[in-house]
């Protein structure tokens, strides 16, 4: 079962700041999505852990989107997620990229859109949001 999650706007996240998301992955999860960007049409990071979706199994797919144009996918094979389990994910904003901090693993994704401020966050899919914090 998938549903639209909350949308946060006017976050004002700049290099040196980070966004931490906590929640519970659904017991029957196929995938979930977290987006960070300027707005819903300018996504600096589309973060999509896939348990079994779009032909991918236990894979994290990241991308960027400007208007309706998607960039090239970046795929991460380290998959620290478990169905039905709590998770904490932190996104650190850097001048030229974002660092995604996961349990026992981290990776970077380039700031392809050259955003100086990340104002937008949304999440949807097989994930129940418990908290969002930024500093």
Curated annotation (Swiss-Prot):
Coiled coil location: none
Tissues with expression: Mainly in the intestine (adult), mainly in the skin (embryo).
A Pfam family it matches: Gal-bind_lectin
Positions carrying N-acetylserine: 2
Domain of life: Eukaryota
Record: residues binding a beta-D-galactoside: 46-50, 54, 63, 70-76
Subunit and interaction comment: Homodimer; disulfide-linked. (Microbial infection) Interacts with newcastle disease virus protein HN; this interaction inhibits viral adsorption rather than internalization.
Protein name (record): Beta-galactoside-binding lectin
Species, as recorded: Gallus gallus (Chicken)
Gene: CG-1B
């Amino acid at each position: 079962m998938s549903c639209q999650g909350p949308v946060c706007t006017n976050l004002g996240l700049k290099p040196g700041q980070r966004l931490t998301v906590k929640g519970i992955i659904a017991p029957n999860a196929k995938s979930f999505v977290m987006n960070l960007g300027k707005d819903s049409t300018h996504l600096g990071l589309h973060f999509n852990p896939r348990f079994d979706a779009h032909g991918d199994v236990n894979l994290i797919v990241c991308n960027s989107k400007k208007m309706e144009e998607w960039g090239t996918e970046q795929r991460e094979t380290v998959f620290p997620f478990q169905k039905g389990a709590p998770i904490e994910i932190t996104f650190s904003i850097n001048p030229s990229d974002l660092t995604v901090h996961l349990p026992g693993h981290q990776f970077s994704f380039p700031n392809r859109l050259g955003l100086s401020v990340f104002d937008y966050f949304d999440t949807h899919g097989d994930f129940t949001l418990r908290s969002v914090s930024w500093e």
